[in-house]
């Protein structure tokens, strides 16, 4: 395949030897990047590698301390995001920010609606302009439909259409697939290819390496704020890219230790919550990692929340070590030895404006409170111990957890719950949105916990993770368990057949 530079095409947007520091922290060090028209270019690196700073530099949020941003080959200074937008640069974030009560057309042309002669908004022209954008993207979305109720995938398409309405030539897509189903990812990739074929330059950021290899032609890799390489993906393997990202050969990504399951630790029998899930039964034994697989909306997270007592169930029973749990009582579940690492770590697993040590210490307040006051020394000692065990990277343990990368935030959530000494650990999407190096660390941790006798129930939408880490795979479809598959029989085909309702339990 001919690269644009081989035909004399110049990069539409580039960085040359850009550096950026925040206090004593050097976020970018002599980083260079070239984005060409008609190409999808990946930006790869672990959390903390400098990807976010690079994106914000291209988008006009940050100004480089050294080096240059080049637009059509000429140095340019963006004084803010508005300058970058006017230059044709748009960022599509993983969580769109639309006004829910406005229509798709109103969201796209907010403050810029076509006007009639007397200054009144020309709704037909706004509708027609939006319809033309959707036609250009090859999607069918009603311009008059309210944004409320749109899927994340459709919201992202609206954001892309909005970017095109500003005549964007460069689209920066930051983890756009993190919350999408497989079919939604395929649809989004169709839109990306359309943009590419129409001459747009696309910078694509994803922790899912298979997506990078599927949609991108070239990749720039960052490590610890430094530029490592910019190169074609053709001829590379995922292992090659991982080595560039982490600077070493990564140990096995799925280091599952073989164990002999012990006694039954968790038993769920005929659990039902009307309209959500029905007649769900399974068990997890000590030393096992049992995966709960299925499509988004199948009811997996809802089952986990009910088991832990966050939500009440209407029928059925849950037992830990043969003793029944009280319906809808998380404190009782904790006391029985259950721990739940939730899917949304920022909203449900952490208090973002609280320190790292306080977040880790939240589950141990009963053991660190003396005479009605928290023993800060005991709390800090306990938190430091777990932060070291899980290799959390931070400047000071008193810093807010919001200052950490996504992978280190996930380690804090894990530390908080492991500090309770759980018999049963439920982890919901444990590696979503974290880099490949941290993902391997989380997998090693789960494997070691199972080897130590903890019963692990792992909810995951990452099929390679399910196949690589689970002793057994339970599959849900539309609120029901449709299959239980052994490790030896589990394949992408058997799991997906059950997840889509094509296999019977």
Curated annotation (Swiss-Prot):
Gene3D superfamilies reported for this sequence: P-loop containing nucleotide triphosphate hydrolases (3.40.50.300)
Cellular component GO terms held in the UniProt record: plasma membrane
Enzyme Commission number(s) from the entry: 7.5.2.7
Catalytically driven reaction(s): D-ribose(out) + ATP + H2O = D-ribose(in) + ADP + phosphate + H(+)
Keywords: ATP-binding, Cell membrane, Membrane, Nucleotide-binding, Repeat, Sugar transport, Translocase, Transport
Localization in the cell: Cell membrane
Gene Ontology molecular function terms on file: ABC-type D-ribose transporter activity; ATP binding; ATP hydrolysis activity
Domain ABC transporter: 13-249, 254-503
Membrane topology according to the record: Peripheral membrane protein
Binding site for ATP: 45-52
Subunit field text: The complex is composed of an ATP-binding protein (RbsA), two transmembrane proteins (RbsC) and a solute-binding protein (RbsB).
Protein role: Part of the ABC transporter complex RbsABC involved in ribose import. Responsible for energy coupling to the transport system.
Recorded family membership: Belongs to the ABC transporter superfamily. Ribose importer (TC 3.A.1.2.1) family.
Protein name as it appears in the record: Ribose import ATP-binding protein RbsA 1
């Amino acid at each position: 395949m001919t690269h644009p530079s081989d035909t004399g095409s110049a990069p539409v947007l580039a960085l040359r030897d850009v550096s950026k520091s925040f206090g004593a922290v050097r976020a970018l060090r002599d980083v260079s990047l070239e984005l060409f028209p008609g190409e999808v270019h990946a930006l790869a690196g672990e959390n903390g590698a400098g990807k976010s700073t690079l994106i914000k530099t291209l988008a006009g949020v940050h100004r480089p301390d050294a080096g240059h941003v080049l637009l059509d080959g000429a140095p340019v200074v963006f004084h803010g995001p508005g300058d970058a937008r006017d230059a044709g640069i748009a960022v599509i974030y993983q969580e769109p920010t639309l006004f829910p009560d406005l229509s798709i057309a109103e969201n796209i042309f907010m403050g810029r609606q076509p006007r009639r002669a007397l200054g009144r908004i020309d709704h037909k022209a706004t509708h027609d302009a939006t319809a033309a954008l959707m036609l250009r993207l090859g999607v069918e979305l009603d311009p008059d439909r309210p944004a409320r109720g749109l899927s994340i995938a459709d919201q992202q398409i609206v954001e892309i259409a909005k970017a095109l309405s500003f005549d964007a030539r460069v689209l920066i897509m930051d983890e756009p697939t993190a919350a999408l189903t497989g079919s939604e990812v395929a649809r989004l990739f169709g839109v990306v290819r359309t943009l590419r074929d129409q001459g747009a330059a696309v910078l694509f950021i994803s922790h899912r390496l298979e997506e990078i290899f599927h949609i991108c032609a070239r990749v720039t890799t960052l490590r610890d704020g430094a530029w490592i390489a910019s190169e074609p993906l053709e001829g590379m393997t995922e292992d090659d890219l991982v080595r560039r990202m982490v600077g070493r050969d990564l140990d096995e990504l799925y280091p599952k230790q073989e164990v002999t399951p012990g006694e039954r630790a968790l038993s769920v029998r005929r659990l039902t919550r009307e309209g959500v899930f029905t007649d769900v039964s399974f068990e997890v034994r000590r030393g096992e990692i049992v995966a709960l697989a299925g499509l988004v909306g199948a009811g997996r997270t809802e089952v986990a929340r009910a088991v832990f007592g966050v939500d009440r169930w209407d029928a059925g029973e849950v037992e830990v070590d043969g003793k029944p749990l009280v319906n809808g009582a998380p404190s009782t579940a904790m006391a029985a030895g259950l721990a739940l690492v939730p899917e949304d770590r920022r909203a449900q697993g952490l208090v973002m404006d609280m320190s790292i040590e306080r977040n880790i210490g939240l589950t141990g307040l009963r053991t660190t409170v003396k005479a009605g006051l928290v023993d800060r020394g005991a709390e800090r000692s306990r938190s430091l111990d777990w932060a070291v065990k899980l290799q959390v990277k931070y400047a000071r343990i008193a810093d807010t957890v919001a200052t950490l990368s996504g992978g280190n935030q996930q380690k804090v959530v894990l530390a908080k719950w492991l500090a309770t000494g759980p018999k049963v650990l439920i982890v919901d999407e444990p590696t979503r949105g974290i880099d490949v190096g941290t993902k391997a660390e989380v997998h090693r941790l789960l494997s070691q916990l199972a080897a130590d006798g903890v019963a692990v129930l792992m909810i995951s939408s990452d099929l390679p993770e399910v196949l690589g880490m689970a002793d057994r795979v339970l599959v849900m479809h539309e609120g029901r368990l449709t299959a239980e598959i052994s490790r030896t029989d589990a394949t992408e085909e058997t799991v997906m057949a059950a997840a889509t309702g094509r296999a019977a339990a």
